[in-house]
Amino acid sequence: MTILNRFCRTILLTNLELTNCGIRKNNSYKCRSFTHTINIDTNHIVPIHTQSNITLELFQPKISVVGVGGGGGNAVNHMISQSLEGVEFFVCNTDSQDLIKSNSINKIQLGPQLTKGHGAGANPEKGRLAAEESKNKIIQTFKDTDLLFLAAGMGGGTGTGSSPIIAKTIKEFKKETIIVGVVTVPFNFEGKRKEIIAKKGLEELSKYVDTLVVISNQNLLDASKSDIQLEQAFLMVDEILHTGIRSIANIINVPGMINLDYSDVVNILKNRKGLSRIGFGEASGEDRAYKAVHKAIKNPLIEIDDQKFTGLLVNISGGNDITLNEISKTINYLQQNADPDVQVFVGHTVDNSLLGKIRISCLFVH
């Protein structure tokens, strides 16, 4: 029986409730707040229903998602359609027609004087100048945000040129804001010019975000069926962006057996250098925990073989049929496959739409 398993069962036997464990360096654990416990007969996770006369003031971070440019706007539309809870959505674009079509109610037209609403014409410099023109609007919109996810497609004009200025502007106004860039880089068929523009955009954006997660469209295409339609390919990209942002937001917002403090999430996201990757895995049936975590860390999208990662943020999602033993197995597997110096933080969220399944997401950060 693992340390975590023994520890949890000891807590149960003394009628204490467990919800919050974070794996720390050297395999030490810490626990804090309590909202779920284990049904000893079934070994399943169940919510705790308690009454208390104590009034607590809880810090609820404001989480925002902003889609910049056409690609970022499409990603936000997809997230809104999937009912991602606990976050507020925004779109920023130079193209007024794209803004009109957006499902988000919070819209910023970038550089209206410069572009007259006609877009940046695939020119990152015009995108940069448009964002510079709209700095005051950007500050006013995001001044109260604590955690910002910035979604964009690299290789065009607005997403590539405006995103770094948006991130820089917010950081200069409120340095405590944690900014996570979640961006895509082009398919090979989009040409060398877009590839070069995207690379320069990544370099510039990485200066101003805390964590930069990069998703390769080409890797996604290579890992999918060869006859996939273009529309399906871009929808898959939007779903990857959605899943990545949801996994981090849910660790903070959704109750579960293991709820990380916001400070833990900040610790692993803040001031990271280099490009980060995210992997996902979902499985059902026998050995579903092992299968899901194996898929997540061996995901072809994340390209981690030649990179040194210093942190790993993991979200384990499942219905109330998920067992403590499955969570323990997942944590053990991650420990065995991670460098001893890597900080590993694990959160668990309950999602009863996943009854019979386990979904695991892993954010690898520098």
Swiss-Prot record:
<keyword id="KW-0496">Mitochondrion</keyword>
<dbReference type="GO" id="GO:0090258">
    <property type="term" value="P:negative regulation of mitochondrial fission"/>
</dbReference>
<comment type="similarity">
    <text>Belongs to the FtsZ family.</text>
</comment>
<dbReference type="InterPro" id="IPR045061">
    <property type="entry name" value="FtsZ/CetZ"/>
</dbReference>
<dbReference type="InterPro" id="IPR008280">
    <property type="entry name" value="Tub_FtsZ_C"/>
</dbReference>
<dbReference type="GO" id="GO:0048285">
    <property type="term" value="P:organelle fission"/>
</dbReference>
<dbReference type="GO" id="GO:0005759">
    <property type="term" value="C:mitochondrial matrix"/>
</dbReference>
<dbReference type="GO" id="GO:0007005">
    <property type="term" value="P:mitochondrion organization"/>
</dbReference>
<dbReference type="InterPro" id="IPR020805">
    <property type="entry name" value="Cell_div_FtsZ_CS"/>
</dbReference>
<dbReference type="Pfam" id="PF00091">
    <property type="entry name" value="Tubulin"/>
</dbReference>
<protein>
    <recommendedName>
        <fullName>Mitochondrial division protein fszB</fullName>
    </recommendedName>
</protein>
<comment type="function">
    <text>Probably involved in mitochondrion division process. Binds to and hydrolyzes GTP.</text>
</comment>
<dbReference type="InterPro" id="IPR003008">
    <property type="entry name" value="Tubulin_FtsZ_GTPase"/>
</dbReference>
<feature type="binding site">
    <location>
        <position position="190"/>
    </location>
    <ligand>
        <name>GTP</name>
    </ligand>
</feature>
<keyword id="KW-0342">GTP-binding</keyword>
<dbReference type="Pfam" id="PF12327">
    <property type="entry name" value="FtsZ_C"/>
</dbReference>
<keyword id="KW-0547">Nucleotide-binding</keyword>
<dbReference type="GO" id="GO:0003924">
    <property type="term" value="F:GTPase activity"/>
</dbReference>
<dbReference type="InterPro" id="IPR024757">
    <property type="entry name" value="FtsZ_C"/>
</dbReference>
<dbReference type="GO" id="GO:0005525">
    <property type="term" value="F:GTP binding"/>
</dbReference>
<feature type="binding site">
    <location>
        <begin position="157"/>
        <end position="159"/>
    </location>
    <ligand>
        <name>GTP</name>
    </ligand>
</feature>
<feature type="binding site">
    <location>
        <position position="238"/>
    </location>
    <ligand>
        <name>GTP</name>
    </ligand>
</feature>
<dbReference type="InterPro" id="IPR036525">
    <property type="entry name" value="Tubulin/FtsZ_GTPase_sf"/>
</dbReference>
<dbReference type="GO" id="GO:0032153">
    <property type="term" value="C:cell division site"/>
</dbReference>
<dbReference type="GO" id="GO:0005737">
    <property type="term" value="C:cytoplasm"/>
</dbReference>
<dbReference type="InterPro" id="IPR000158">
    <property type="entry name" value="Cell_div_FtsZ"/>
</dbReference>
<dbReference type="GO" id="GO:0010637">
    <property type="term" value="P:negative regulation of mitochondrial fusion"/>
</dbReference>
<feature type="binding site">
    <location>
        <begin position="70"/>
        <end position="74"/>
    </location>
    <ligand>
        <name>GTP</name>
    </ligand>
</feature>
<dbReference type="GO" id="GO:0051301">
    <property type="term" value="P:cell division"/>
</dbReference>
<dbReference type="InterPro" id="IPR018316">
    <property type="entry name" value="Tubulin/FtsZ_2-layer-sand-dom"/>
</dbReference>
